């Protein structure tokens, strides 16, 4: 899924991967919440700091579609300098930023955004949830 090793990450930045403008020469990304016209620019939503809990940091690309295609995952990650893709983090980051609230995220992966994603998600959801909860508890203890 990415060049980062592991299955649980501290998210340091989030971008929306499906917000922008569809043009004749392809899709153009914009910062979520900005008008999708004029020169394209994507500014990541920066997470607040978490204590060091020994997890790698990642930039996540969020979209509204469940990704079951490794080529699409790669296009999103390469096009937006992301390490991971998901459906939640960027939306939370955007709303928090709009409201002037700090946000932080820990992401445990459930699948590799490929043809096996549906069965992988079902099989791995409980383990990933537990892993993320453990990491969050550790971070809170260190705050």
Per-region residue spans from a language model:
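A C-terminal functional module that forms or caps the active site or interfaces directly
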Residues: 66-118
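Generic non-transmembrane alpha-helical segments
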Residues: 45-54, 95, 134-142
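Alpha-helical scaffold segments in soluble metabolic enzymes
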Residues: 59, 75, 91, 131-138
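Generic structural signal for well-ordered, non-membrane alpha-helical segments
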Residues: 41-43, 69, 85, 89, ...
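Mid-sequence, gly/pro-rich, charge-dense loop/helix-turn segments that line enzyme active sites
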Residues: 1-80
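Regulatory input/activation interfaces that engage signals or partners
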Residues: 103, 108-143
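Glycine-rich loops and low-complexity Gly/Arg-rich segments
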Residues: 15-19, 33-37, 82-87, 110-112, ...
